[in-house]
């Protein structure tokens, strides 16, 4: 369809496609307003090792960063930085910046992994990470993992629709998809090699969630030789990872404005940065707006996720969709992919999202 969600669903013939696509765009915009706070924390933490309070009491330091003016300030800085990247478009802005960030991300991650696996208690962390306990493999774990994969790779999400619109007809779509999944999974696996040995070496629960990142790991860095250096690298890594997500979110909203208004890219980005900042500030300061918006984000998830496979495989036609996918592919996908796209893929999406909502 060579377009963002609203225009793409229209072109594919999905009834009310323009408005259903608008829901997807609005949802991503709300998520960005909230997520900018989290990414903003990682930006603030890049400079945290310079502050004595960070080392003295990590929990109190995180509390001061995660609420109040610091949270709002760094959320807005994150939004502005994201806007500056998106303002230059895919080819001149997003593509080169993300490419260099990914190179830096891999480099930093490898340094952290090498340090983590050479810690005295690293073997316990590696054992926890690599030896499976199949008694814990419940349906909930599987579906939660699926939901995480959908979010991480933006499967059935508006960002993937937008990024996919920039593919040329002759591009190898299957190879692009496999490369994306492989790269994402590789980073996730390497991150596990970096985090779990550190956590287990210093007696930190690997189930600590956000507290693991912002409270427990600083305790560990404090006890490590070169802790200042590795703490700084770690949070640069976390910020780069978060920024790649915010860039994709803002590009979705920007593309929608460009499709349906006469705005230039710079005007569209400037308007969106202003609006999202105005949403992000009260969210960061008081949690307002998000207390209500999160219900829309949660319950609209299955609808937004199921739209691409319905539009592509059911409305546009599975045979035609397969022909488009195979156009330019070195290795063609077989007829089996039709059944995957029409039945297995949508069922997996709905199961993961609905289980998380009902659970």
Model-derived regions, located:
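Inter-helical loop and helix-membrane interface segments of multi-pass membrane transporters/permeases
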Residues: 5-23, 36-91, 120-143, 208-214, ...
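Transmembrane helix-loop boundary segments of multi-pass membrane transporters
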Residues: 1, 7-14, 23, 41, ...
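Membrane-embedded translocation segments of transport machinery
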Residues: 95, 99-243, 267-268
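C-terminal membrane-solvent junction of multi-pass transporters and transport-like membrane proteins
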Residues: 20-25, 67, 260-273, 295-357
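Membrane-helix boundary/coupling elements in multi-pass transport proteins
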Residues: 27-40, 157-164, 180, 209, ...
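Helix-loop-helix connectors at the membrane interface of multi-pass transporters/channels
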Residues: 39-66, 166-170, 175, 179-187, ...
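Juxtamembrane transmembrane-helix boundary signature
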Residues: 1-14, 36, 198-205, 311-318
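Loop-to-transmembrane helix boundary motifs in multi-pass membrane proteins
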Residues: 68-73, 183-191, 228-231, 240-243, ...
């Amino acid at each position: 369809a060579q377009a963002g969600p609203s225009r793409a669903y229209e072109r594919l013939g999905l009834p009310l496609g323009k408005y259903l696509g608008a829901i997807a765009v609005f949802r991503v915009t709300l998520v960005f307003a909230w997520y900018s706070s989290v990414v903003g924390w990682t930006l603030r933490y890049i400079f945290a090792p310079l502050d004595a309070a960070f080392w003295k009491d990590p929990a109190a330091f995180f509390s001061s960063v995660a609420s109040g003016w610091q949270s709002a300030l760094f959320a807005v800085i994150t939004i502005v930085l994201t806007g500056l990247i998106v303002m230059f478009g895919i080819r001149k802005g997003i593509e080169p910046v993300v490419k260099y960030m990914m190179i830096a991300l891999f480099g930093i991650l490898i340094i952290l992994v090498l340090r983590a696996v050479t810690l005295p208690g690293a073997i316990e962390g590696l054992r926890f990470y690599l030896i499976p306990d199949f008694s814990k493999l419940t349906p909930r774990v599987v579906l939660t993992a699926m939901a995480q994969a959908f979010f991480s790779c933006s499967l059935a999400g508006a960002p993937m629709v937008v990024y996919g619109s920039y593919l040329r007809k002759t591009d190898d779509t299957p190879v692009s998809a496999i490369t994306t999944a492989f790269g994402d999974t590789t980073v996730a696996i390497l991150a596990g090699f970096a985090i779990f040995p550190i956590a287990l070496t210093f007696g930190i629960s690997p189930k600590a969630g956000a507290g693991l990142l912002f409270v427990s790991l600083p305790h560990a860095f404090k006890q490590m030789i070169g802790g200042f250096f590795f703490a700084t690298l770690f949070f640069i890594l976390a910020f780069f990872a978060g920024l790649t997500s915010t860039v994709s979110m803002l590009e979705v909203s920007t593309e929608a404005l460009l499709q349906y208004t006469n705005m230039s890219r710079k005007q569209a980005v400037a308007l969106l940065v202003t609006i999202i900042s105005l949403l992000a500030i009260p969210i960061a300061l008081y949690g307002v707006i998000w207390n209500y918006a999160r219900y829309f984000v949660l319950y609209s998830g299955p609808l937004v996720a199921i739209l691409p496979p319905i539009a592509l495989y059911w409305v546009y036609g599975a045979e035609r969709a397969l022909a488009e996918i195979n156009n330019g592919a070195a290795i063609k996908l077989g007829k089996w992919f039709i059944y995957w796209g029409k039945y297995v893929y949508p069922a997996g999406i709905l199961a993961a999202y609905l289980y998380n909502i009902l659970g």
